[in-house]
Amino acid sequence: MHTKWKTWAHVTKLDPDKHLTEDEIAEIATSGTDALILSGTLNITKDNMSQLRDQVKEYGLPLVVEPAGPESVIFHGIDLLYVASVMNTSDARWIVGKHRDWAMNPDIVWEKVIPEAYIVLNPNSAVGRVTGADCGISAEEVAAYASIADHYFKFPIVYIEYSGMYGNPDIVKRAGEAIDHAVLYYGGGIDSAEKAAEMAKYADTIVVGNAVYEKGVKTLLETVQAVQ
């Protein structure tokens, strides 16, 4: 296990349902990003998750799988499994329900599992729609969810997820101020060095995903250089 995950400043999220060339994968893997997270919300299966893992594993970066559901969980050939619970949804399936179904599997490698407390804040994102997250909450409510996740539920990661749009830095700042032990992740809309540097002021780890597909690897490199 890569035990230094708490020190990662920049991680890159790759979607098994989207295509990258071999050259693009090589550039991403050698960009200076600290780790790769293999994750997506729609059309994610064990097969395409495993295929993406096989494409990137030769580069030696820490590999994390963040499954959308039990159907896309893999353990072989990866370092960690990030499992999200959505704090700001009233649909219990996304807090603990799907987790219960998954835990019926006797083959779970618990040593690789890292729980995440997701706070989803983009109502137009796939993750927002699928989970029924209440994305219109205030900064105070976000901070309260973050505090509960950290102090009460003891989640090791609190993840502010704007997924596809750039978020409010003040909300991220407030969330960071509310936690004492968890690592604060921020993901959403980071497509420039300036945005990466701004969110890195408040989050321990920034996540760059869509920019890889929408703006190219050059933009990813700029975000890495801004925070490393």
Swiss-Prot record:
What positions does the entry give for sn-glycerol 1-phosphate binding? K13, Y159, I160, E161, Y162, S163, G164, G189, G209, N210
Write one Pfam family the protein is assigned to: PcrB
**Top-level taxon of origin:** Archaea
Location in or out of the cell: Cytoplasm
Cross-referenced InterPro entries: GGGP/HepGP_synthase_I (IPR039074), GGGP/HepGP_synthase_sf (IPR038597), GGGP_HepGP_synthase (IPR008205), GGGP_synthase_archaea (IPR026438)
Q: What class of enzyme is it?
A: transferase
UniProt keyword terms in alphabetical order: Cytoplasm, Lipid biosynthesis, Lipid metabolism, Magnesium, Metal-binding, Phospholipid biosynthesis, Phospholipid metabolism, Transferase
Q: In which pathway does it act?
A: Membrane lipid metabolism; glycerophospholipid metabolism
Cofactor(s) the protein needs: Mg(2+)
Which biological process, per GO, is one annotated for this protein?
glycerophospholipid biosynthetic process
Reactions that this protein is recorded to catalyse: sn-glycerol 1-phosphate + (2E,6E,10E)-geranylgeranyl diphosphate = sn-3-O-(geranylgeranyl)glycerol 1-phosphate + diphosphate
What Enzyme Commission number does this protein have?
A: 2.5.1.41
**TM spans (from-to):** none
Q: Name one GO cellular component term.
A: cytoplasm
Q: Does the keyword Metal-binding apply?
A: yes
Positions of Mg(2+) binding: D15, T41
The protein's GO terms of the molecular function aspect are: magnesium ion binding; phosphoglycerol geranylgeranyltransferase activity
Family named by the database record: Belongs to the GGGP/HepGP synthase family. Group I subfamily.
Q: What role does it play?
A: Prenyltransferase that catalyzes the transfer of the geranylgeranyl moiety of geranylgeranyl diphosphate (GGPP) to the C3 hydroxyl of sn-glycerol-1-phosphate (G1P). This reaction is the first ether-bond-formation step in the biosynthesis of archaeal membrane lipids.
Q: What is this protein called?
A: Geranylgeranylglyceryl phosphate synthase
